[in-house]
Amino acid sequence: MFVSNQTFTGALGGLAGADQKCQTAAQAAMKKGTFKAWLSDETKGPSTTFVKNPRKYLSTSGLVVANNWTDLTDGALQSPLSVTELGVAAPGDRTWTTTSTAGAPQAGREQCTNWTSQGNSGNTGRIGATDATWTDDNKSPCGTTRRLYCFEQ
């Protein structure tokens, strides 16, 4: 798992577009496997679209972020998720998410019109946090560029 080195506006092309951005970043960094964005729209999020991994979730730097899916979605991370696919510290402080700590869509929260628009706003997570703010911190205008959390499936 990694934080995307590249930043994007909230017009990501929906969840599928965000997943493709993660996959492209992973492939460019010579990572094998399938990668998806930790991102939710009005009806879907990682809790319904991800493989719920029974194995450890490791950052690009090799740190254990969570022991398994249950640990990942319990509200706190063991280590910060703050390294890009290139193995360097992620510059900046926010990622697009609109995802609860449980991996579910956040009802009533804005998500850049299902991640297709630069209008409105979208909720963000805080890069480097290990408490709930890693995924649920603040909102940002959709025209602002933010990073993505990318998870191997």
List PLM regions with ranges:
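Secreted/extracellular ectodomain signature
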Residues: 1-153
